[in-house]
Amino acid sequence: RMPSLSIDLPMSVLRQKLSLEKERKVQALRAAANRNFLNDI
């Protein structure tokens, strides 16, 4: 069980980092879209 755990842990950490970066990109895109929207008005 221990070896599989040592492999699983980094994978979950990587997955968390990836989802965090994806979230950040989405937020940035949304902010840019909001700015463009406000500029268009």
UniProtKB/Swiss-Prot annotation:
SMART domains: CRF. InterPro entries: Corticotropin-releasing_fac_CS, CRF. Keywords: Amidation, Hormone, Secreted. Signal peptide: none annotated. GO terms for molecular function: hormone activity. GO terms for cellular component: extracellular region. It is found in: Secreted. The modification Isoleucine amide is found at I41. Belongs to the sauvagine/corticotropin-releasing factor/urotensin I family. Regulation of fluid secretion. May stimulate primary urine secretion by Malpighian tubules and causes a dose-dependent stimulation of cAMP levels in the tubules. This is Diuretic hormone 1.
